[in-house]
Amino acid sequence: MKFKRHIYLLIIFVSTTIAQDYDVSECIKIALDRKGTLVSAGLDVESANQGLLGSYSGLLPSLNVSTASGKTKYPDQEIIIPDLVNLEIDTVSSGESSYMSAGLSINQTIYNGGKSLNTVKQAKVNLEIAKLRERNTKTQVIQNVTSSYYGLLKAQQLLEVALKNLSLSEKQVNLVQKQFELGAVRKTDLLKANVSMGQAKVELLNRKTSLENSRRQLFNDMGMIDFGQSIQAKNSEWIPVSVPSSAEALGLLKEKNPNVLIQRAAIEIGNIQFKIAKGMRSPSAFASIDYSASGDNSEQLKESLKDDWRLGVSMAINFPIFSGNSLSTAQQQAKLSKRKYENDYLTFLNDLRVQVELIRKSIMNYSEIIPINQDVVSAAEEDLKLVQKRYSIGSATILEVLDAQVSLIRSNSTLINTVHDARIQEMRLKALLGMLDIEYQTKEEEIK
């Protein structure tokens, strides 16, 4: 037992000390295997599938088998039965009687205004909605993991910037200290350098905290238990993506977005409910067949089933003449619900269309901004090197050095934040166009 415990602690220790590199696809696959919300969504699909199977009961006949037996006891009594033919008198004594019966009945709905058929159609639409909601859940999991992953990558990169900034500040303090001791610079230069180094230390502590929080968030979104284990997001170069045109985006939005398809399915539900309400005014026809037999005991019952059985066939037709205002009210309510679903669909589609257009424009904007930011970083790096050389020979002030250092930090941070925002917007566009979850479909899901 102690050996197993030591092995377990060793595994935790190794996992916490050795950072594991993951790309975003690996993190998403782990989340799709572990996240409990996907299990719940799958159960909803299975429940809807069972509802579809149950809806066929309205179209199929019902078969019932019944059997009964009974025995009645009462005080002994003699019954005198005169035989007028033979001029004799018979007596019968009895104190109990028994009864046994068996029957088979088949009932079938012939017509009920299309209610049974429409109930099946409604169950099919409900199953489709459950599958679309499962897609929604999967998309949300992928979005959360992607956002957390790039949040971790951003925190890693900003931590690297903070480390470089602190290193530059320490070197600057050492340089100013030597020059101050030689009398080449004033004490205010040394104080300014120390202030800059102190600010760099504070920034580094904040970045470490942000990195730890991002790590925890990613583990939670991946559905993993956080034991303090390290994880490293792989740094990859940002590559501009192709942005669909407005017409292409609208087409994908209508055909692929799960929420849009759910709204469209709701309209179909409204149509079916209206047909059901309308069919309630139609006559209903039912038919049944009954086969039965009875006897005083099991032997007589067997004989009756062979020779003395009874067969009954019946058919009933119901005409709904008047039922208050219930039928007309139900029909009007179904009609209003149908109009509401149609209005909700158009409103929802227009809202998403605007969102897609805004994201399209922002991604196109990022594709122009990021190269400019990259050039700015390169220029800031070169500027800092030149100012440091000038300061070392006394042709630049400490303020110029600090300004160049701050400019480099800001340009690096701006580039990191801009690339992060661009990746998040690209992910959001894929999600809105219904393409995000399709990228991570399993072979079984593709077959379905």
Predicted regions and their residues:
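Small/polar, glycine/serine/threonine/aspartate-rich low-complexity segments that form flexible
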Residues: 66-105, 234-243, 275, 288-319, ...
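Periplasmic alpha-helical coiled-coil/stalk elements that build and connect Gram-negative outer-membrane
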Residues: 22, 26, 50, 134, ...
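Bacterial Sec-pathway N-terminal export signals of envelope proteins
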Residues: 19-68, 74, 226-268, 321, ...
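A glycine-/polar-enriched beta->alpha junction
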Residues: 29-39, 46-61, 96, 103-122, ...
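Acidic, low-complexity, intrinsically disordered peripheral segments
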Residues: 64, 73, 414-448
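Amphipathic alpha-helical coiled-coil segments
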Residues: 40-55, 137, 141-160, 171, ...
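Sec-dependent N-terminal signal peptides
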Residues: 4-15
